[in-house]
Amino acid sequence: MVVALVYAFDTCLDRIHLLKKYYTSKGFDVVSVTSNFSHRKKAVYQAKADVVIPVREYHKNLSADRILSHIEFSKKARKAMEDIQPDLIHCIIPCNTLVKEMAKYKKKHHNVKVMYDIIDLWPESMPIDRYKGLLPFKIWKNNRDKYLSSGDVVFCECELFKKYVHCGSVLYWAIDRECLPMNPDLSEDELQFCYLGSINNIIDIPMITAFLRECSIKKKCVLHIIGNGENKEHFIQEVLCVGVNVVDHKEVYDPVQKQEIFDQCNYGFNVMKPSVVVGLTMKSLDYMCAGLPIINTIQGDTKDFCEEWNIGLNLNKGNIKEMANIVCLESMDVQLQRRKNIQNLYNTYFTTKHFNATLSEALKRIYGG
């Protein structure tokens, strides 16, 4: 049997790696279909896939070129299905127009099974509240919602997304490696925080700096940064302005080196603008695997995990001072227990074993057995 993995962007390669590994282990012939354009770098790149579709380039997240590029990829991906003739299509969403085009393909080829795997909500997850009600954005959203019923299975990457698309089951992300042992090296007299990931337009820099300002009143504070992004220099300057030192590690890929940084830190920041609809972030999985508790503003799944599993603190505009006081005054025993809690959470929901089991249940629903 042939499974086609269809994905437009390079932002989901970790998930694609897990899917390829799973389907290959189940005896499927896997054919990967993607574009030649890096959404992350906004440039053409050498994609490692069986079918690479050339598409229009774009340089802004909100642009006509971006929409036209998505439409072009989706239509060409449907044509690629005619050549591949897959038994199963596992389609990563966004882009939203892929749902429409795969629905057209399924209407013509009744025997094919289709899985839609929603890993982001466009336009809901974009920090553009004042525009989301406009007609172009409604059409963009409807390209997904109107055709989801054509899927035999609809996955969402988190419980929060299910509330928006009104269907589906959760396929949480996983990290395809063993978590390293924790060796916390914390000080009673100093607080160290970590920011991991891209520093872009959806990060709530004012929230982070306001929190750090309050913490620095009571204790010396240090922020470790692992990552880059268009707003990085601005972020660093804002943090320095509130009296907090910054250690810029740039991009770190070595798990051992990353773990050593996490072991120095009391908390990791998982903070985005309130208009962004996200229930779980990849950075939070890295924090979980490393045993690093979080300062969190993400709604849905992560907020609930913080409350139910005691893995960190939920931050909002109204409780910045209160949360800073808690962090500054809490005992080392409380912090160490949170480190155990967050790694236990990871081992419960976010391992490859759990990821594969969820996929197996879906295949049973489709094919029986």
What residue ranges belong to the model's regions?
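N-terminal subdomain of nucleotide-sugar transferases
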Residues: 1-51, 153, 210-218
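An aromatic- and histidine-rich active-site surface loop
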Residues: 13, 39-40, 70-74, 86-110, ...
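Membrane-proximal helix-turn-helix segments that form the acceptor-binding/catalytic region
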Residues: 75-78, 97-100, 104-108, 122-124, ...
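Conserved donor-binding/catalytic core segment of Leloir-type glycosyltransferases
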Residues: 155, 185-203, 208-213, 223-224
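Carbohydrate-associated surface elements
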Residues: 160, 173-174
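Nucleotide-sugar-dependent
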Residues: 203, 254-261, 266-288, 295-305
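Nucleotide-activated donor-binding/catalytic signature segment of Leloir-type glycosyltransferases, i.e.
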Residues: 233-260, 264
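A charged, aromatic-enriched C-terminal amphipathic alpha-helix characteristic of glycosyltransferases
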Residues: 318-324, 332-366
